[in-house]
Amino acid sequence: MLGRWLIFAGVAGYLLTAFHPAPAPVVHEVQMGARGGNRFEPATTTARAGDTVRFINGNGGPHNVQFFPDSIRDPARDLLDRAMPGEKLGWLSSQLFLDRNEVYDIVLPKLAPGRYPFFCLPHAASMTGAIVVAP
């Protein structure tokens, strides 16, 4: 009797997880230099693999997105660098954005949960942020 119950519980658990749809990808918007300030708004964004983090140049820049390579371990560094589209200023660094409302999308790859800090190269002293990858 106990054996049948365990089999039933195992099958039910499998069915609940196998057919539970994954959350739909979400677009998270981050303003760069909005309202005349040199900052990212919001400064911290929580996202999952498959979500898009959309950086929007709010004031015409120049702005960019540069991840701190020393704070990100392999293989996450390489995965994140490959997820950054277009021409780059360097490793883990987007190009400069000069036009107001210019958009830069990063579709998050499957990264280990944790904090992935970034900054704007021209305004590094005050313009910092982070993507927190949720499990």
Each predicted region: which residue ranges?
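N-terminal secretory signal peptides that target proteins for export/translocation
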Residues: 1-2
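Bacterial N-terminal signal peptides
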Residues: 5-17
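Extracytoplasmic copper-binding redox domains, predominantly the cupredoxin/blue-copper superfamily
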Residues: 14-135
